[in-house]
């Protein structure tokens, strides 16, 4: 697989979601958690979604329980939390693993394409962000300390390239 849109992921209801449906759009993929110090970033992600979705931005939330068990809920609990607490309307998909032998293939591809600090592949923590351009290639990887609004200029640049 050579670009993000070659992959298929799972929706919260277990159905398959081909990323090809967003071919030609800019994608921001984020591993999320409901009980994390970075959880308030849902608010910034939703703000980006509302501002840029009509211009070609897709935000995909990937719940993950690999970091200190901070996403223990089932799909219904996660959806309810996101909706009621942060009024999230961007797609929040099925819970996945982002590291190790059980890692979702999309995350294996993204971490190979864009390494972290000191060249590491592993996702460091919840709310690591991967910005993917209209060509399906990873543009930027950001750690959890980078707030969603800090990506605005990169998003605007990526949206302009198409």
Where are these regions (language model features)?
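Chalcogenol-based redox active-site neighborhoods
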Residues: 1-162
